[in-house]
Amino acid sequence: ERIAGVLLVGYAVASLLAAALSVAMLASGANLRSIVAFLLGGLDGASWPRVIAAAAPILAATLALAARGRPLAAFLLGDEGAMHLGIDVRRERGIAIALASLATAAAVALAGLVGFVGLVVPHLVRLAVGPDPRAVLPLSALGGALLLLLADSAARTAGLPVGVITALIGAPLLLTLLRRARAG
């Protein structure tokens, strides 16, 4: 648990600093703009054919994860608790990781690397509705979509990649959530 906290703090700080560095790079040269735009993500290059192509694996993975609600909920009991309920922990964990990776790969192919949406939103949803993945997964998807739309609107207004906005929102929120979790 402590190692995970250290890793998440490191990710938050690194992403915030990378966003600041990327803004400086964007201002300095046109050749770097396309690389940095992908690294920080955005919806400006999205088209209906690309959205439909990405939607298929995302929807398939999401529905498959939703169908695995019982094993995912059993993980809340820890590995031993899940095993006592008859869950093949290694198999189910592998399936969950593969499905999450499929959805993530499709989303990154569409929008680039947009940080913090998948870290912060599920934590906030979990605080609001509890840990049951049958509620957390769909609400996180809706909350993530809403955050991305709001961040994209702000990014377009400011002329920045959406990843800069999500880092500016997500890093402080993640650090606050981690500090609260550590304190209590």
Predicted regions and their residues:
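Alpha-helical transmembrane segments in inner-membrane proteins
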Residues: 1-184
